[in-house]
Amino acid sequence: RTKDYCGKCGRKSFGKMQDIDFFYEKGKLEVCTIVKEPTNKFTKLGAYIYGIISFHNGKVRVPGRLTDHILKDEELALSCIEDREVVPRFRRRYAVEQSDIIPTISLAFTFADEYYPYQKHEVVKPNKKYETPGIVGYGVYVSKFRIKEDSIERSIPFMDEDSITAAVEAGKLALIHSGVDPSLIGKVYVGSESNPYAVKPIASKVAQVLKLGEEEKSDGVQGVDAVDTEFACKAATSMFKDAAALTYYPTAHIPYAMVIGTDNSQAAPRDEPGGELDFFVGYGASAFIFGMHDVIAELEGWYSCTSDTPDFWRRDLEPYPRHGGRFTGEPAYFKHIAKSAKKLMEKLRLQPSDLDYFVCHQPNIRFPIKVAKELGFKEEQYIDGLQVVKFGNTYSGASPIGLAAILDKAKPNQRILVASYGSGAG
């Protein structure tokens, strides 16, 4: 965020400056330099590029750091990257001690034509109203960096990323995709089990950066209800029905609700107890906007089941989760996924052949394929949602990212069954 002003007189009009948010805009890297010996707070970044970025055809200039860029030992010709277009990214500002507040900034930058290309944010007025609520828009964010092993790739965060930054980026993409006015979002849920804070919500940061709800500029607050949820890997999907119900309930006065699943999935080193998880953990987030207008996927029904099954856990103050070995399979994952999917199909009087797509929680490659086959689904029904092979197990983002992949190609009147799972268990 910065101020737009006249380069000659220093005023916008009538002696007032205009408050502008550049987070959705595209700029140009005018000049830059390489910081080869960062100060203590930036040491973990290594050498990085710092420059001047201009917006609005050079009328506004701000300093900024180029992120997602690893400088090699060889010299980089700065003239090759100057004058290239860049887009703002939400990142950690610099490294701090474990007990400190994490500083963030929405004006770190990446090149506009790389990985996540620039997309214009255009607010569209609500048009058609549906009888039942559903998904209005969605967005997925995963890092550009990967670790590839055998048949799986795992997304890993850059040094200035975490579950908070991924949540903001996914929410931003959902707003761009839907065209929804951020001020009309009255509720935001963020589900995660890797919040960098033990006590401090992610949702409040998302609401502030994305300007969700009516903005009270004088007080610096957003008129939105923001809350974090936690239930292992189903922390986000469990809020789908709550978000949809709120937009349907007339006296709630909530036109739209946003649900985000975000995780920087954790695992112990491979030579320690619980280290088997490290073969599959990934990083990413997905965001869905629910409402009654311009619905792209209606919510037809749901079913949930829960049991106190200790198949996966992390005790307070412990850095890594533990799991119950083979106990995480039949008595936990498979039982709950199969039970919920069968009961929902029974409730809606559907057979697997009546559905076009099936997506479920994806802790690895084998589990979702096995449960899909046991339920009677064919490969063409579940393969498109199997995103664990590209990004790893993104925990709270896993089945939602699979759903987003299916929505990318699904056609009108096709049916999708989503069966999420959270260890603990439900």
Where are these regions (language model features)?
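Glycine-rich active-site loops that engage anionic ligands at enzyme catalytic sites
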Residues: 29-72
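OB-fold/S1-family single-stranded nucleic acid-binding modules
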Residues: 81, 89-121
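Conserved catalytic cysteine-centered active-site region
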Residues: 154-162, 194-256, 262, 370-402
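Cys/His-rich short segments
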Residues: 1-24
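Short nucleic-acid-contacting surface segments enriched for D/E, G, S/T with interspersed K/R
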Residues: 69-89
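Condensing-enzyme catalytic core mediating Claisen C-C bond formation in acyl metabolism
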Residues: 118-161, 273-331, 335-342, 347
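Short coil-to-beta-strand transition motifs
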Residues: 17-28, 79-84
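Phosphate/pyrophosphate-binding loops at sites that engage ATP/ADP/AMP, CoA/4′-phosphopantetheine
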Residues: 170-186, 338-354, 375, 410
